[in-house]
């Protein structure tokens, strides 16, 4: 059983809300830096004052308790202040993926029911393109370096408002005092397996996500936490900004993830801990080795999921590593600690807070060693999603048989370690065998000429599916399909060796580095796809 850290239990019961955390920090650490940027430092008090000014401006704009407000902003201090301002009002934050456009963007805007969006000026053209499709939006607040719009101008049926008009001079605001069951946000999932869904997030849900990361990284008040993730994503907002506030630590706010700049930024700010998605850790690991790789300030890194070379990663960069498994809907029910049992685990269940079962298609529990869908139940109220926004039918389907169905295939071993196998939609059924796309990807990525790869199912001629891999070579490399198959023949069972290969310069991804496999599945086989069977290249049986 995983034991949670008592130090992170400061905000118990009804105090597990953003409002209580900020109020506490203003008393005990008001002048301490909460956020560091390339241009300055911002204390807890600085951001609270800015949040008060913005809360007064939003109230004047007509925003009230329970209203949804869209934030489509790049990483900036104003994003954090607006998040706090909306919480002060009791309004509901709806972060927008900054890469959304077209119908995907208009769907999210309309589905949220928001009347107000605050958007960076660089996204104004995208909003303009779909403005005629907006059903409820009445106000667009434009923020950024571009010339601000004339107040009262129109975007479709919505009025344009300069950011300066909501930035009042009054820093004082009588904040709403929420409870853990009050709604804080609607977080739209990143859409790696289909259209985005709005997850209803309570204060308790967001708090527990952030508090859990404190345990996973052993975050202390003295820590400087650097994780180059976008604030519109839960990992950027809760696992970093919110976690350091609960711990009383300091966070570094980056713009975007850059493998080339990562270590220099860590050294610049003396960062001691970080959170890396597996794709980010993989790119860091695949950078050319340098003599000073271990000469950095990082001590602890949370990598989700682990890279197969995690032990080499730890030694090369001189860090401890832990991992977890989770998602927007179900939070993070597992912890590994820094003593990793192996390079494939995603931790053990935190039995104080969650129940997790591995089940078959009829929700019957499966024994250790057998992969199935992971289903979750909380032991404490309000720490997983309250449902899907405006889609009760999706909520009922997700919570069938009184368990939250995650859509993730996991497997448990006899010692209670859990292993991520695949997304249920990414699992491939070929000739009676279930194939993990992630396992095939790991072997392809081990080829010295490969930077990264995505493996997807495509329809077979008769029944079931075939394996297709989209491969991104390393710069300057041009691996032959036949050579890659020969490499995989020695590393994979015959039925897992891809039939189809396609080489690409890049893979479609979310801003947090997750490969958007649904886009690859929809595209499927193309004119550029190489067919192993047509080329008469055999596999070893």
Residue locations for each model-derived region?
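Conserved AMP-binding/adenylate-forming core of the ANL superfamily
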Residues: 10-15, 31-76, 80-84, 101-106, ...
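Conserved pre-ATP/AMP-binding loop-to-beta segment of ANL
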Residues: 31, 158-161, 167-188, 195, ...
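Structural core segment of the AMP-binding/adenylate-forming
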Residues: 38, 56, 60-61, 84, ...
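A short helix-loop-beta submotif of the ANL/AMP-binding
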Residues: 68, 74-94, 98-102, 107-116, ...
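AMP-binding/adenylate-forming catalytic core of the ANL superfamily
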Residues: 100, 106, 117-119, 356, ...
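AMP-binding/adenylate-forming catalytic domain of the ANL superfamily
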Residues: 143, 493-514, 533-541
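Conserved AMP-binding/adenylation subdomain of ANL enzymes
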Residues: 207-224, 232-272, 281-283, 287
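Gly/Ser/Thr-rich phosphate-binding loop
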Residues: 263, 268-276, 285-343, 354-355, ...
């Amino acid at each position: 059983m995983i034991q949670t850290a008592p130090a992170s239990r400061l905000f118990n019961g009804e105090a597990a809300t953003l409002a209580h955390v900020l109020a506490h920090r203003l008393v005990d650490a008001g002048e301490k830096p909460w956020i560091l940027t390339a241009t300055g430092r911002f204390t807890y008090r600085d951001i609270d004052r800015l949040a008060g000014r913005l809360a007064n401006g939003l109230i004047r704009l007509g925003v009230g308790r329970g209203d949804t407000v869209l934030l489509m902003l790049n990483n900036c201090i104003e994003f954090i202040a607006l998040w706090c301002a909306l919480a002060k009002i009791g309004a509901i934050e709806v972060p927008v993926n900054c890469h959304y456009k077209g119908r995907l963007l208009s769907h999210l805007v309309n589905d949220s029911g928001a009347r107000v969006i605050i958007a960076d000026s660089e996204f104004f053209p995208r909003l303009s393109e779909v403005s005629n499709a907006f059903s409820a939006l009445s106000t667009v607040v434009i923020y950024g370096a571009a010339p601000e719009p004339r107040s009262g101008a129109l975007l479709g049926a919505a009025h344009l408002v300069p950011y300066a008009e909501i930035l009042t001079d009054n820093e004082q605001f009588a904040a709403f005092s929420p409870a853990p069951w009050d709604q804080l946000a609607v977080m739209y999932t990143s859409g790696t397996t289909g259209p985005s869904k709005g997850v209803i997030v309570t204060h308790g849900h967001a708090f527990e996500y952030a508090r859990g990361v404190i345990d996973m990284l052993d975050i202390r008040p003295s820590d400087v936490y650097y994780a180059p993730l976008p604030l519109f994503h839960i990992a950027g907002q809760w696992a970093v900004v919110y976690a350091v506030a609960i711990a009383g630590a300091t966070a570094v706010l980056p713009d975007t993830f850059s493998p080339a700049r990562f270590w220099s930024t860590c050294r610049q700010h003396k960062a001691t801990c970080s959170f890396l998605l597996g794709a980010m850790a993989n790119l860091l690991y695949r950078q050319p080795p340098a003599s000073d790789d271990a000469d950095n300030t990082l001590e602890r890194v949370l990598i989700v999921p682990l890279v197969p070379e995690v032990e080499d990663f730890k030694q090369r960069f001189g860090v401890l590593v832990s991992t977890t498994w989770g998602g927007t809907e179900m939070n993070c029910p597992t912890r590994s600690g820094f003593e990793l049992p192996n390079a494939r685990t995603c931790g053990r269940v935190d039995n104080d807070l969650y129940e997790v079962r591995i089940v078959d298609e009829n929700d019957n529990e499966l024994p250790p060693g057998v992969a199935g869908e992971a289903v979750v139940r909380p032991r404490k109220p309000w720490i997983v999603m309250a449902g899907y926004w405006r889609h009760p039918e999706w909520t009922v389907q997700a919570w069938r048989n009184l368990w939250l169905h995650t859509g993730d295939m996991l497997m448990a071993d006899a010692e209670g370690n859990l292993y991520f196998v695949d997304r249920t939609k990414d699992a491939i059924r070929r000739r009676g065998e279930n194939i993990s796309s992630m396992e095939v990807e790991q072997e392809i990525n081990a080829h010295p000429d490969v930077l990264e790869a995505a493996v997807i199912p495509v329809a077979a001629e008769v029944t079931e599916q075939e394996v297709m891999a989209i491969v991104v070579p390393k710069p300057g490399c041009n691996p032959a399909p036949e050579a890659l198959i020969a490499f995989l023949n020695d590393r994979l069972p015959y039925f897992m060796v891809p039939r189809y290969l396609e080489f690409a310069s890049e893979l479609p991804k979310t801003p947090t580095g997750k490969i958007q496999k649904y886009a690859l599945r929809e595209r499927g086989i193309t004119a550029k796809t190489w067919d192993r069977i047509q080329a008469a290249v055999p596999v070893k049986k």
